Amino acid sequence: MVCTGYATVPHALLMTLCKRWHAETNSFHLPVGEMTVTLDDVTCLMHIPIEGRMWSHPKKMSRTDGTDLMVRHLGVQQAEVLKNCNEEYGGYISYKALREYYEGYIDSATRLSDPKNLGDPQKLERVLTAYVKSYFLYLVGCLLIGDKSNKCIELVYLTTMEDGYAGMHNYSWGGMTLAYLYHCLAEASLPGDRALGGSVTLLTVRNCHI
């Protein structure tokens, strides 16, 4: 799943669909009639929950707040986080840096769980927790709520993990994915806009079933 996203979908198809999108009805106006993406499509094609709390963040997260989230949830040293959180863009991290983090956690967990050289079990648990959270954040960016730059993900999504794994299940990830896709399609349908954010994977798969 981490290999999907904006870089792997047919851009010409997406831009053609954007030209057909009408924000007033949240639907595509095609020669054969109207079509849209529904919550039923989300749950059937992506198998993510559509029930639960909706979540939004109207303000862009600052670099300072994003750094605090990285330190608290992913166990990264503050000095290292500041290198990867650009001052200009605030609380964002690149896919490349995030991928390096979770791949590093995999290597650390493998060493700590080696029967021939068992490490501190509490440290192993912290490493595994950081791995799951960083991988989840990567999936959110690649599959569900992608940035139109196709380069980075907002660190604010780490706040959905404040209550642990059980708390993450309380959110309607399907509902948020669809709402954000509608928003991105409305922006991309405007004259002069040539980029599309949101779950382009969902949009592509849905249109393969027309």
Residue ranges and their predicted role:
Residues 169-176, 188-201, 207-210:
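Compact beta-rich and alpha/beta scaffold cores in large eukaryotic transport/transcription complexes
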Residues 1-182, 198:
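N-terminal leader regions that mediate targeting or early regulatory function
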